[in-house]
Swiss-Prot record:
UniProt record similarity statement: Belongs to the IucA/IucC family.
GO biological process: siderophore biosynthetic process
Source organism per UniProt: Sinorhizobium fredii (strain NBRC 101917 / NGR234)
UniProt entry tagged with the keyword Amino-acid biosynthesis: no
InterPro entries, per database record: Aerobactin_biosyn_IucA/IucC_N (IPR007310), IucA/IucC-like_C (IPR022770), LucA/IucC-like (IPR037455)
Gene Ontology molecular-function annotations: acid-amino acid ligase activity
Domain of life according to the entry: Bacteria
Protein name in the entry: Uncharacterized protein y4xN
Length: 628
């Protein structure tokens, strides 16, 4: 680690100590939420004080007791720790728990599962790395916020969002907000910032929450060694690339000619700069030597989006996003770009585009960032694409971010991120435009927000069997000049799930991707895997988090916002009922969304079990069932 970067375990300055304390609390709070939500610790074993928010949890194997000084229960069984945690032994002695490692070791013997032999230590290493990176990010966020406050004041803008709208093209304003919203990561991932293997200066140089600018190399891949997937309107790969990146295409072709090569024999293949120097040159040395892959070429500067490896060129005129593999472990997964994403991104983009073009109501409520083109290294004789997960690309059109209708695109995670002016979540700046922050106004705003998300999402699922992964990173809301939500903009279809009988019944087709060792995403027999994907992403990770935020920020009474969400979900079901395949199907799905427990991904358990199963889920109390 860089000597200038303080160690998490040995902070040397007051600022570092404050940042460490904040990072440690962040980690502990995420772990507490996951431990109880995933039933690794039984929430019904908590002993609550008659008044206030104190609670105790018995650790029977060790004959000890956890004491929470400020623990609150929100809808969906969400336990939020806002105070100190102590452990009491049999003598009554107390010891405060100040770091996540101490918490996990204290509860390890009481977990409802048996972790893998190295599961706990791997988890703690990733949590520690998350804390290090969280400290770096929040230190830089303080500096970035100070700069922005000065710029906003000098511009006389009423807020951060207004300042961005005035000072940048809409697509770059949207990307600034996307990077701004990358600070917190997934709302409850316990390894929310883990990037093991990256030095501190690399984390800062490559990560969106630092406002990074990252170069991409436009390398070359032998066309005979490439598989290309494209939407029907796209011509050849090279023609599309030349049309969308004319200067790069020209420089790339001239470079090949200067090296004695014919550009017609090659495809331009963007490669992330870090990935090229730290992985590709070493792991693909044989392909480079054999003339299959040429690592030389021109470069383009890009803005990494919230996903870290989907990049938007910094050009004044919008260019397509470039999604790439990066051989870095982040939030406990290596960020490859598998063949499934190359094949299914353009295919699902085509299917969804065809559906939306025929559905007037959907067209008014929904836009998508289409994945027009993808390519991957593929062995010309065996057809093997496995190695290509490290040499691949998907291009995603960015035109929907370049607005001319006055709407501002804001990635959902940015709405929940503290703004630079007053430190409140940015969603509060949008609500504040009305000048009315009464409870009735908050409920009205959330009703419109929920309708904006729920109507198109449920229509696409219930009528066509297509589930958007509409969590905070993939969902963008288009807001009007009054700060009101108007449309949903969805991205990332490579892993989208679908239920074939529904869209085929309505005359549509989708070629599924099937490959050994890769989880399928198109299903024929069981819609529950598609439904759980949608509920977890859209309802648990997105709408529930918005309701939690607004309830806390505006002291909204009880579960009234979940009651609003229930009403909007009920209304969506009633509207769609005449078009659904059967009343039995309508009733089954209505009960799944409104009455039965919600499925959610067990991210902490997966980590502890070393990812032996990527589809482990747990059940959350359905907050809509109790909000009648």
């Amino acid at each position: 680690m860089d000597e200038k970067t303080p160690s998490v375990t040995n902070p040397v300055e007051n600022e570092d100590l404050a940042l460490l304390t904040q990072a440690s609390r962040n980690a502990i709070n995420r772990l507490v939420r996951c431990l109880f939500a995933e039933r690794l610790l039984a929430p019904n074993a908590l002993l609550w004080a008659r008044e206030g928010r104190q609670a105790w949890f018995p650790l029977w194997p060790s004959q000890r007791m956890l004491h929470f000084t400020d623990l609150s229960l929100a809808p969906a069984g969400t336990l939020r720790n806002r105070g100190q945690i102590e452990v009491l032994d049999g003598t009554g002695a107390r010891q405060r728990i100040d770091d996540p490692a101490a918490l996990m070791r204290e509860v390890a013997s009481s977990l409802a599962i048996t972790p893998a032999s190295d599961g706990l230590e791997h988890l703690l290493r990733d949590v520690d790395n998350s804390m290090r990176n969280d400290m770096l990010a929040r230190r830089e966020r303080g500096r970035w916020s100070a700069r922005l406050r000065q710029e906003i004041a000098e511009a006389g803008a009423p807020g951060f969002l207004a300042y961005l709208e005035r000072s940048l093209p809409t697509h770059l304003a949207a990307m600034t907000l996307d990077q701004w919203g990358a600070l917190e990561g997934h709302p409850f991932y316990p390894t929310w910032k883990a990037k093991p293997g990256l030095a501190a200066e690399e984390v800062a140089a490559l990560s969106p929450e630092f406002g990074a600018r990252v170069p991409l190399r436009i390398a070359a891949l032998r066309s005979s060694w490439a598989y290309v997937e494209k939407m029907p309107h796209v011509g050849s790969y090279s023609e599309w690339f030349a049309e969308n990146f004319p200067d790069l295409s020209r420089d790339w072709a001239e470079g090949l000619k200067a090296r004695g090569q014919s550009p017609e024999d090659w495809l331009p293949l963007p490669v992330h700069a870090w990935h090229l120097e730290h992985f590709v040159r070493r792991e693909f040395a044989a392909e480079i030597e054999a003339g299959i892959f040429d690592p030389d070429g021109p470069e383009i500067v890009t803005l990494p989006s919230m996903s870290f490896r989907t990049m938007l060129p910094t050009t004044e005129a919008p260019r397509p996003f470039i999604k790439l593999p990066v051989a870095i472990w982040m939030t406990s997964e290596q960020r490859t770009l598998q063949a499934k994403s190359i094949h299914m991104g353009p295919r699902l983009s085509t299917l969804i585009s065809d559906i939306v073009s025929e559905e007037d109501d959907l067209r008014c409520r929904l836009e998508i960032l289409t994945e027009e083109l993808g390519a991957i290294l593929r062995h010309p004789e065996t057809g093997d694409e496995h190695l290509g997960r490290f040499l691949s690309v998907v291009y995603r059109k960015a035109d929907a971010l370049a607005r001319r209708d006055g709407l501002l695109p804001v990635t959902v995670a940015a709405l929940l991120t503290a703004g630079p002016v007053d430190g409140r979540p940015l969603i509060c700046e949008l609500i504040g435009k009305s000048g009315d922050e009464s409870e009735a106004a908050i409920a009205a705003f959330f009703r419109l927000y929920a309708r904006t998300v729920v109507r198109p999402t449920l229509a696409m699922y219930l009528l066509y069997g297509i589930a958007f992964e509409a969590h905070q990173q993939n969902s963008t809301i288009l807001f009007d000049d009054r700060g009101l939500p108007r449309k949903l903009l969805i991205r990332d279809f490579g892993d989208g799930r679908s239920f074939a009988p529904l869209f085929t019944e309505r005359g549509y087709e989708l070629q599924p991707f099937s490959r050994g060792g890769i989880l399928p995403t198109t299903f024929d027999d069981d819609i529950s895997l598609v439904r759980s994907f949608l509920i977890n992403a859209c309802f648990v990770c997105h709408l529930h988090e918005i309701a939690l935020c607004l309830t806390e920020q505006y002291s909204v009474a009880g579960d009234s916002l979940w009651r609003v969400l229930r009403e909007e979900t009920e209304e969506a079901f009633e509207t769609l009922r005449p078009r659904m395949l059967s009343d039995a199907f309508w009733l089954e799905e209505r009960q799944a969304f409104l009455e039965r427990p919600w499925p959610a991904r067990s991210v902490l358990r997966m980590h502890l079990e070393r990812y032996r199963d990527y589809r482990i889920e747990h059940q959350l109390p359905n907050p809509l069932a109790s909000a009648e």
